[in-house]
Amino acid sequence: PGMCVLSFAFNGEKDNKYLPEHIEKNSVCYTGTHDNDTLVSLLKNMSAWDKNNFVAGVKNSLKEMNAGGNADTDEALCDAVIALGFACKAQLFVLPMQDAARLGGEYRMNEPSTDKAQNWSVRIEEKYFAERTAEDLRSLAEAYGR
């Protein structure tokens, strides 16, 4: 199956194969992988040009997929990317806890080709599990049949 990473989808290219509306059923969709930065950190560190493309792409995908949500704030943008992952046709959607809880780059799982002490040692404190409740994720799962 194809591996579709939404963090790479919204770069301004309308034919980008990672756009949620282009994802095929026989694939796995992720907001990001263990080697990507978190959504929050990705948005924080983007150039203005990249951020404009990202926001425009998310807004377009929300419209194309008839998914609720908006991209008016960084928090809403993260929520919209997550909703698009749930809404896409991929057989499987993987949502890293770092993105579900809207955590920053200090919670990145791994930075390839580095020997940082943080690599593979990330632990998420219990308090972050309350930030985005199971009910929020259950609602998305039910809405999109996951």
Task: Walk through the language-model features, giving the residues of each.
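Catalytic cores of glycan-processing enzymes that make or break glycosidic bonds
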Residues: P1-R146
